Amino acid sequence: YSAKEDRDIYKGLTFWSPNVNIFRDPRWGRGHETYGEDPYLTSRLGVKFVEGIQGDGPVMKAAACAKHYAVHSGPESLRHEFDAQASMKDMWETYLPAFEALVTEADVEAVMGAYNRTNGEPCCAHKYLMEDVLRGKWKFEGHYTSDCWAIRDFHEHHMVTSTPRQSAAMALNAGCDLNCGNTYLPVSYTHLTLP
């Protein structure tokens, strides 16, 4: 069913799935969305999910979105202010393998950043995770989106910026292409300092 005014809505869908976070903290209220606590199993199931959504034809009819990049698994009540501390060993052995597989094997079209910070930096403006790893090492060419209202968290909860304008600039400068929320809207793109 589609109303006449809605005939152009939902063309070229992006499904914000799969959730390939590693379920390590039972206080996280979204563990049921994941494939569990095993990085290898999560990567295998995630790759097949993306292939199923995106297909293997010449035209992508729907796009998958790997979420929530990258060290996100609770606790739920602190997700907007939490700073996940992860060693490089833990990051590369636990949290990043599924994302790497979805990008390098399944060519996932989109990646969604998490609400939380990882080692002090918001995941939706994390230079190392977004530039060095995702777009650099893995050669990701799709679009990066924030989780809903995650950019607002920069100035309201993480306190890494003071204003929505600073938060938008921080996210855009780091390569966050799409903001699920309204932080980008009141800002004139011509006033931002972009590289």
Residue locations for each model-derived region?
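Glycoside hydrolase catalytic-domain context in secreted enzymes
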Residues: 1-192
